[in-house]
From Swiss-Prot:
It catalyses: ATP + H2O + 4 H(+)(in) = ADP + phosphate + 5 H(+)(out). NCBIfam families: atpA (TIGR00962), PRK13343.1 (NF009884). There is a cross-link at residue 499 (Isoglutamyl lysine isopeptide (Lys-Gln) (interchain with Q-Cter in protein Pup)). Pfam families: ATP-synt_ab (PF00006), ATP-synt_ab_C (PF00306), ATP-synt_ab_N (PF02874). This is ATP synthase subunit alpha. The gene is atpA. Keywords: ATP synthesis, ATP-binding, Cell membrane, CF(1), Hydrogen ion transport, Ion transport, Isopeptide bond, Membrane, Nucleotide-binding, Translocase, Transport, Ubl conjugation. InterPro entries: ATP_synth_asu-like_sf, ATP_synth_asu_C, ATP_synth_asu_C_sf, ATP_synth_F1_a_nt-bd_dom, ATP_synth_F1_asu, ATPase_a/bsu_AS, ATPase_F1/V1/A1_a/bsu_N, ATPase_F1/V1/A1_a/bsu_N_sf. Its EC number is 7.1.2.2. F-type ATPases have 2 components, CF(1) - the catalytic core - and CF(0) - the membrane proton channel. CF(1) has five subunits: alpha(3), beta(3), gamma(1), delta(1), epsilon(1). CF(0) has three main subunits: a(1), b(2) and c(9-12). The alpha and beta chains form an alternating ring which encloses part of the gamma chain. CF(1) is attached to CF(0) by a central stalk formed by the gamma and epsilon chains, while a peripheral stalk is formed by the delta and b chains. It comes from Mycobacterium tuberculosis (strain ATCC 25618 / H37Rv). ATP binds at residues 172-179. The keyword Membrane applies.
Amino acid sequence: MAELTIPADDIQSAIEEYVSSFTADTSREEVGTVVDAGDGIAHVEGLPSVMTQELLEFPGGILGVALNLDEHSVGAVILGDFENIEEGQQVKRTGEVLSVPVGDGFLGRVVNPLGQPIDGRGDVDSDTRRALELQAPSVVHRQGVKEPLQTGIKAIDAMTPIGRGQRQLIIGDRKTGKTAVCVDTILNQRQNWESGDPKKQVRCVYVAIGQKGTTIAAVRRTLEEGGAMDYTTIVAAAASESAGFKWLAPYTGSAIAQHWMYEGKHVLIIFDDLTKQAEAYRAISLLLRRPPGREAYPGDVFYLHSRLLERCAKLSDDLGGGSLTGLPIIETKANDISAYIPTNVISITDGQCFLETDLFNQGVRPAINVGVSVSRVGGAAQIKAMKEVAGSLRLDLSQYRELEAFAAFASDLDAASKAQLERGARLVELLKQPQSQPMPVEEQVVSIFLGTGGHLDSVPVEDVRRFETELLDHMRASEEEILTEIRDSQKLTEEAADKLTEVIKNFKKGFAATGGGSVVPDEHVEALDEDKLAKEAVKVKKPAPKKKK
């Protein structure tokens, strides 16, 4: 047997050196097991330290969110394809709460509720992430709404104005033009975006919740054709997606928008629509065995929407003065705005525009019911020119609707009532507007001035819209300085109003009604004053009394 030639001291020092330099390549993972799975929900055992809203990793890289933390199991919502999740599979904790990438790289992109691009244009360029469940700005971090957000829709900007940082609910039955109102509002921000002025520019986020794929594609196409995708992000959770995605989509959109708001920028976010999010959350809650409440919704469905919509704010100047304006959409059934979800969201928001089926079917589009629609804070942000010309518009229309119902049964009306009906019919016609044709605010002021100033009283109702269109074309070509003055000063001075009246009078002389008649009103002839009339004394000769015989 050969002798050991290496000294014992060398062996000892080599072992000590190896031990001192050794690092154990081990990691501690908390692993659970799927007990049962189905319908986008999985119950997992063996994760005692998991946090609420924590991300869990299922086999195949599929993610889930821990929602129910029971004594012996965790109820998780699976985000994505849940068909391959089976009983017995291992589930790992990630130690992270749900977050999405944010930044300017999202402009012009279509993403899913996880922030992953689905438009086939490669990865989104982003190096910042934002948690989905961040608190809304506190009271001290906010300031009052004072800047207008122009929608380009006459009926809204005149009667239910929206300010930057406001939450204005768009509510109505299906197929009444709710999405069209919001898309037109996005299109109307194009001029501000092209100005390059950060104080005017408004970034837009459109969140599609449970919409048909064809509807989302049509919205994207409309925005592209209108040049609006340059400043818009679409977060899409189509009808075919899981309930988890529909529940999550609004929070993803608001996280992307909040990032810009805290950078001092102005953002508009549209939730289309929150009814479907509430229904998805109801499905998730029932599958997780949470106790149902009214209409089978869980008890925290109010909190679901309040914590989302409270993120809309006008930040204080110390935080950059950015704003996030929200236009949530709610779909009603049979015009019932007193149902559970509609009343919840009405109480959370700062006003609502109610779109009515009957008005829509009568051809009044946008079909806004003036009597029920209101804006609680936007009036402070309305420009002075619009306040001056539209001050009596709401009252005039409300009285017209009331008188219209009465006139259906009355056989004879007095002259004042007839005049009110005539003007009301012209105002209704004036407020009609084609889809995807938002109007600049200075042209809206001229248009409303026509109606409330009585300049359309001599124009036949069927010619009102043609008269308005041709007058605005004439002013763009020959009277641009009046429009520019209104746009820059945001006021309608007495001098500008006189000029505008003169332009309208001159334009009427060359405008021919459909029947070929003139629209120039007849000159008003004033009655002569009684003092100016020559007084004539009339003497009456009485016959002499007969003598008595």
